[in-house]
Amino acid sequence: MTKLHGQVAVITGATAGMALAAATLFVTEGAHVYITGRRKDQLDDAVSEIGGSVTGVRSDSGNPRDLDLLVDAVRAGHGRVDVLYVSAGIGTVEEPLTAVTEDSFDTVFGVNVRGALFTVQKLLPLMSSGGSIILNGSTVWGKGIPGQSVYAATKAALRSFARTWAAELAERGIRVNVLSPGPTDTAMIAGTPPELREKIAALIPLKRLGQPADIAKVALFLASDDSSFVTGIDLSVDGGLAQI
């Protein structure tokens, strides 16, 4: 039997990269997956690429009204959620302290922190007992990387959320964990010069960038019963970058 046979999963921000890879794997492993994205054209393309048992819902995680539409769609379609993977997020790799504005701060925190909280809160009534909530973090929160203070702070907030929510939801058997990718070969990295990509890879103990499939496999572990005794952790998938 597949690892997610008959389960219902929601993955936000799943039109590309790591979350798209996770959605594809979850469907392969037997789940019906609801994916979200802000742009309908990208969402439609992702649904077509995944194929099979998937539903696309246009939703901006930074907009509470859009989150209500997501809840309505899941309630009407299946009435429950077994796995919630909060992957939607935004940020920039180059925003030093002197460049941060009120608008840029509010925008990043609005999606990455407020959006994550209200995504979980609004879908919580549909969460099955024994379900899994996965928050998409990042290894940058503990590294002190210049130009990423705001983005890193949002990921540190998710780490705090996971610990608190794991304690709050333990009575329902709901597990809450953070999945923190390191440098991964997605569109953001693909747009950098080759020499920079090589420098980044050289910093990683395993001497390569992560692939979306690497992240998807760990998301599957956290989503499935394989991690039934795991909650409140921050699981780094970074080739050892933040560990060694």
Question: Which sequence ranges carry the predicted segments?
Answer:
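Catalytic Tyr-X3-Lys loop
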Residues: T98-L117, I134, L158
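Short C-terminal tail/terminal secondary-structure segment
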Residues: G91-E94, K143, L220, T231-I244
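Active-site helix of classical SDR
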Residues: V120, T154, A162
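Residue(s) in the substrate-gating loop at a strand-loop-helix junction
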Residues: S138
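Conserved glycine-rich cofactor-binding loop
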Residues: V8, T15-A16
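Substrate-binding pocket helix/loop in short-chain dehydrogenase/reductase
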Residues: E95-L97, T101-F109, I189, L196, ...
